[in-house]
Regions:
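N-terminal secretory signal peptides and thylakoid transit peptides that target proteins
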Residues: 2-14
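Bacterial N-terminal signal peptides
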Residues: 12-22
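Boundary at the C-terminal end of the N-terminal hydrophobic targeting segment
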Residues: 27-31
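Extracytoplasmic "Venus flytrap"
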Residues: 33-62, 66, 70, 74-88, ...
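Hydrophobic alpha-helical segments within soluble ligand-binding/sensing domains
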Residues: 37-38, 86, 140-155
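Flexible loop/hinge segments that line or gate small-molecule binding clefts
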Residues: 108-146, 150
């Protein structure tokens, strides 16, 4: 189990980075995470703030495909733009004993304390497009400006 926990952060970063590749290739994972000894024992929670629209459906599809390819147990929590519910869902993921949490979007004010509770519980956390203002949590972000500029250049 110790080996699994050490690899959870690499897995989370890989999942978060992998889903952005089909969306324009702007972000690329530098290295793939090492294979897991017992991937079925790894539980990852994706806690979403935004879920409607093509981008968010493609993002979810990418996370699900990557989790399936790695053989990990993925739990998806969808707060539907309810900041308090998203924070509660992080707490639910902590209670489930997940190995890692991907926080997808959200509000800094509501996610800061929830993310810290996960870190305090020994859970690896990655934040995608939400600044939780925590040096222990890797941030995966994209520039909407640069994506828009690229789209216009390719049109």
């Amino acid at each position: 189990m110790k080996m699994i926990r050490r690899q959870a952060l690499s897995l989370l970063a890989g999942l978060a980075a992998a889903v952005t590749l089909p969306l324009g290739g702007m972000a690329q994972a530098q290295t793939m995470p090492a294979p897991l000894d017992n991937p079925g024992e790894v539980k990852i929670a994706l806690v979403r703030y935004l879920s409607t629209g093509d981008f968010f459906q493609a993002y979810l599809s990418g996370v699900e495909q990557q989790a399936k390819a790695l053989g990990v147990d993925l739990r998806v929590f969808d707060s539907r733009q309810d900041a308090a519910l998203q924070a509660d869902m992080v707490d639910q993921a902590i209670a489930l004993g997940v190995d890692g949490i991907i926080i997808q979007h959200g509000l800094t004010e509501s996610m800061q304390e929830a993310a810290q509770r996960a870190v305090d519980a020994g859970i690896k956390v990655v934040a995608f497009d939400v600044n939780v203002e925590n040096k222990a949590i890797p941030q995966v972000e994209q520039s909407d400006y640069l994506l828009g500029k690229l789209a216009l250049e390719q049109a």
